[in-house]
Amino acid sequence: MALCQKHLSIWNFALGDSPDCLSHANKIHIPHTWNSRKYSENYVGKGWYQTTLTPGFLPEGAKSCLVFHGAYRDTEVYVNGVLCGQHFGSGYTPFTVDITSALRLHEENEILVSVDNRFSTDALPYDRSFDWANDGGLIRPVDFVATGPASLRDTEITAMPVISSYGKRQHAGAALFSFRTKTDSSIPGCTLHWALFRGATDSITPRESEPLLSGILPCTEHVHLDPVLLSDAVYWHFDRPELYTLALHLELPDGFLSDTSFLEIGFRELKVMGERWFLNGEPVRLPGVEWMPGSTPTLGMAESRSKLQDMLLCLKDCNTVLTRFHWQQDDWVYDWCDRYGLLVQEEIPFWGKQPEGDPEKLWPVACRQMEEMISAHRHHPSIIAWGVGNELSAQTWPVQRYIRRAVAFIHEKDPDRLANYVSNTAFACPEQDGAGDGDILMINDYIGTWHQGFEQSSAWQALVDAHPGRVFIPSEFGLCEPAFEGGDPRRASIFLEKLAFYRTLPCIAGTIYFCLNDYRTHMGEEGKGRMKCRVHGSTDLYGTPKPSYETVSREYAPLMVSRVPGGLSFTCRNDLPAYTVSGYVFCCGGQTFPIPDLMPGESWFWEGTPDDSACIERPSGFSFSPAL
């Protein structure tokens, strides 16, 4: 937030190499991509956007900027004919353009933006080496933001539970809190007023709500709050996503408010120890599904927030706890994951075997994307890991060197999160694959389809033997049509067969099934234009479930329910998934029955006769039907 913020949602738009094309512009609303329109679905090149802005009163020395939440891809920004900024090589990370010197107060200002989605060997994704849509445009919101002469940026927050012992979930207790932020103020005597509140931003009123902690710090270029111990923090968990809000107010010496910021955080710890990982002290095995955004043909990568929410709900409704994104998502997506409980690995879009040989030439853009991604999203408790690449040639030394360098870079920037590489080559020679250089070995397992010549059990055993005492996650498994036959029935059987095997290996701490949905991709085998896709999902392009969706939902439920004489037996799964159920409620016949806390392997008996309305509610409000 800032002193003034305005969404710039209505623009004039046209395709062409120069802004002259705007003489025949159409009026559009942001977010927007030209590749979701029938007349331009195959267009690769430049698009031009034009709008006007008339700022009202701003204080003396005010700073103004445009915040782009995502523009795909190479972007130039002009204000009143002045080139104010460029952002090349990255289409999914947010960026800010300072327009202070070009902006005229109390007058109409012309804003002109060009966006170019031509395939590039200087960008990530690299050239044509990526398996999703090449949708160009202002695909996410654009905001005008103004502050006083001093402003805040790059706030880093530590919100870490103090776990007293490992082996059982801890819901609340002691926690460490600290933060550091940067200011661009050269004005002596500025102060930073801060306060920590319990609750999400929309549930607090800073002037009326009582903060848990607060204080005033003198401002320099770097402002730092030393760690503070909270005695009774409620920990963030995917079933109980408890949020806190850090409010920052930057004041000038005369008391004038120059900038503000509100960041939602959560206290949670995810720790890898040996061949297990622990969430807030509990060893867990977590079920996951990946969703490929941008797949509704009429919206593309410019999906509305209502559509994004529909697909996120689709993830939650099939009992997903863990997911990953091949490319960076809008901050709003992670706000949703924070509030409703999803664990996420966010990745830079470095995908496939291109460029051949040494990827060193891409280090500058990879480094910049990792910095932009971490800076924008590190406060989100839902994000547990960063990804440095997917399906590169990780059996070669140059790629392994890149992976090690990227993992080390992330650890330096964010030591509280995991850094991983996702491999599709690990079965070929397990001991020399780059997957081992991440904190977790993330393995794309297409044995039986893309990966020919391997037997499931022996291939995995060789991989585990090559990396003893490590955590593994099958990060993709599923069926891609029409490359492979069998349709949705085979998709369901592959899911069941793979999951049954994964359950036998204790070192597999989670799974990420691929894919939630059929997805649009420029390299798809089915359809044309905006309909070009891969049939890989348990829903269609629009999110309509196929029969295999129910299979995933049933197998990923944390409770197994069976009929027994006199009622039902509820057993907390002890294979995969495996985590404590706490605060769950059984709903039946218009009544609710609290289920006692059950650790993996424990059972509870309910006396009665279930009817068709029977369902189980999580404490987060999501529910699932028992498989009776």
Language model feature labels by segment:
Residues 1-40, 114, 197-201, 482, ...:
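Accessory carbohydrate-binding/adhesion or oligomerization-edge regions at the termini
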Residues 5-6, 11-20, 39-153, 186, ...:
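Accessory beta-strand-rich segments of carbohydrate-active enzymes
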Residues 26-31, 37, 82, 88, ...:
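Extended substrate-binding grooves/exosites of carbohydrate-active enzymes
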Residues 79, 170-215, 569-595:
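Beta-strand-rich binding/interaction modules
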Residues 103-108, 180-273:
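Extended acidic/polar, glycine-enriched regions
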Residues 159-175, 562-564:
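Short, solvent-exposed loop/linker segments at the N-terminal edge
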Residues 210-231, 589-612:
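Intrinsically disordered, low-complexity Pro/Gly/Ser/Thr-rich segments with frequent PxxP/GP/PP motifs
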Residues 248-252, 257-261, 610-628:
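Terminal connector regions
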